[in-house]
Amino acid sequence: MARQALRSTLWLLPSILLCFPFCLPLSGQHVTELPGVLHCGLQSFQFAVNLSLEAESPVLTTWDSQGLPHRLKNDSDCGTWVMDSPDGFLVLEASYSGCYVTLEGSHYIMTVGVQEADVAGHVAGTRQRLLTCPLALQGKAPDTPNAKVCSPVPVKERLPCASSTISRGDCEELGCCYSSEEEGADSCYYGNTVTSHCTKEGHFSIAVSRDVTSPPLRLDSLRLGFRNITTGCDPVMKTSTFVLFQFPLTSCGTTQRITGDQAMYENELVAIRDVQAWGRSSITRDSNFRLRVSCTYSIHSIMSPVNMQVWTLPPPLPKTQPGPLSLELQIAQDKNYSSYYGTDAYPLVKFLQDPIYVEVSILHRTDPSLSLLLEQCWATPGSNPFHQPQWPILVKGCPYAGDNYQTKRIPVQKASDVFPSHHQRFSISTFSFMSAGREKQVLGGQVYLHCSASVCQPAGMPSCTVICPASRRRRKSELYFDNSTSISSKGPVILLQATKDPAVMLHKHSGTHADSPTLWVMGLSASMVITGVLVVSYLATRKQR
C-alpha cells in the first residue's frame, strides 16, 4: 500500500508542479492569455511577444516549480536569454535544460507572463502563457515547399538553390523547389518564401523573395547585422524577385553563444523602411520585415550542423476583428469641440435654447474603413433610456422634423488623432419636459441624452452614409441599422429658464413668502418711522440754536 501511494504521488507530482504558477502567485488577480508567437527549437523555446501592447513598464516573468516568480533576464546559468527589438518585440529563449522548464510526459513546459500594474504601482493582473514543446524534435527535416510557393516563380526569375545535377530529395532537404520539366531551366530553385540553411563550410545561406510580404518587399532595403553593420555583407546574388545572402558565421554582426558542447550563431535580416515626411505627417509604403536566423554546430566540428532555425516577425494584429462595440457620448464645452466635460462636471447647468454640443464616437478601434452610424438619439428625464416621456432628437440618423428648434448635424474635420468616420457630432437647443396635463408644468428640469448606433463598412460609400432630409434620402431598404448599441450621457443636464426682470428674480429667490398687501403695509410703516426720525432731528437742532 505504501509503495502504491508513493507511485500515485510521483505520478501526480508534475501536475501539481504545473499548477503552482497558476495558483500561488496569481490568487486574487485577473489572469488573461498573453499573445505571442512560439517556436520550438531542438534545445530551447523561442517566444516572441509585442510588449508595446502591454503595460507601460512591462516585466516578463516566469514561475519555478515552487510557484515563486522570477523576472526573466539573460542568465546563462538558468538557460534564459531575453533580446529586445526596435519594433517593440521581445524575444525570449529558454533552454529545455534550464531552471524554469519542466518535462511533463512527452512535452517541455514553461509558464511566462507579463504583470500589469495599476496607478498606485500595485500588481493588478497578469497576462500569462503556458509554453509547450514536444520532446522529440531531433532529426526533423526542413518542410518541403508546397505548390503555392514553387509554382508562381517564373522560369526566367528562378534563383538556383543548388547545382542542376542535384537529386529531388537532396534539393527538397534544403527547403528548395524542384522541377525537371522545363528544358534549360534550373531544376533546384528557391521558392516564394524565406529559405535558409547552414553549410558544412560554416556559412549562413539566406534567400528572400519579394513576395513574402504584402505589399512586396523592397529587396534593396534588406540589411544584415542590424546591430553591427560591416562591409562585405552585401547580397551575393540578386534578381528582380529574389535576393541571396551568403556569409561566414563570424562576420556581418553574427553573435555567438556557447551552451554545453554546442555553439549557436545568430544574425538578423532587417528591411529599412523608407519614411517620407510632408508637413507634420510621415508616410511609408514599405512593409515591415524582420528575420532572425540561427545555426547550431558542435564545438568539436562544424562539418555537421546540428540545427537551423528561423524566426520571423510576428504578424501584426488585425485592424478588423469581431468584438463588442464600445461607444462614448460626450458633451463638448464649445462649438469647436476642443474640450469635453468630464464625469465630475455633471450635472451640467444650461439655460433653455442654449446649444448643447454632443459627440458620439467609437472607442478602441483604429480601422479607417469603419463608419459610425447614428440611428436614434433621444432625451429622457431619467437615466433609464426607456424612461417616459421621451423626446426624439435624431430619427434614423436625421434631425427630428417635429421640433421648432431643429437639431443641427456638425461635420467632423480631419485631424491627426481623429478618424472622422469614427465620430458623429450634432448640436441641440436645450428644452424642458412638460407634463401631459392642461397646466403643462416643467418636469424636474433635467434631461439625460441617449443614442443608438452601429458600425458600417466601408466608410464613405453610399451604403454607409445617411442623407438628410428625408425627402432626399435613399429607399428605406438601402440602409440598415442592424446590431445597434446604445450609449447614454455621463450625467444629467439641468435646464433653467432665463429671465431679465430683476424684480422677478428677487421675488423668486427671496426667503420670505409674504403676499403683496403685507409688503405694502411694511413699506408704509418703514416710511413713517423714517419721516418721524427726521422731524425729531430737525426740532432738536432748532432748540439748540
UniProtKB/Swiss-Prot annotation:
Expressed in oocytes. Residues 540-545 are cytoplasmic. Residues 472-545 form a propeptide. Its main location: membrane. Residues 1-28 form the signal peptide. It is a single-pass type I membrane protein. It is found in: Cell membrane. Glycans are attached at residues 50, 74, 228, 312, 336, 483. One of its GO terms (molecular function) is acrosin binding. Residues 29-518 are extracellular. Proteolytically cleaved before the transmembrane segment to yield the secreted ectodomain incorporated in the zona pellucida. The chain crosses the membrane at residues 519-539. One of its GO terms (biological process) is prevention of polyspermy. Residues 148-192 form the P-type domain. SUPFAM superfamilies: Trefoil. GO terms for cellular component: collagen-containing extracellular matrix; egg coat; extracellular region; plasma membrane. Belongs to the ZP domain family. ZPB subfamily. PANTHER family: ZONA PELLUCIDA SPERM-BINDING PROTEIN, ZONA PELLUCIDA SPERM-BINDING PROTEIN 4. The ZP domain is involved in the polymerization of the ZP proteins to form the zona pellucida. Component of the zona pellucida, an extracellular matrix surrounding oocytes which mediates sperm binding, induction of the acrosome reaction and prevents post-fertilization polyspermy. The zona pellucida is composed of 3 to 4 glycoproteins, ZP1, ZP2, ZP3, and ZP4. ZP4 may act as a sperm receptor. This is Zona pellucida sperm-binding protein 4. It comes from Rattus norvegicus (Rat). The lineage of its organism: Eukaryota, Metazoa, Chordata, Craniata, Vertebrata.
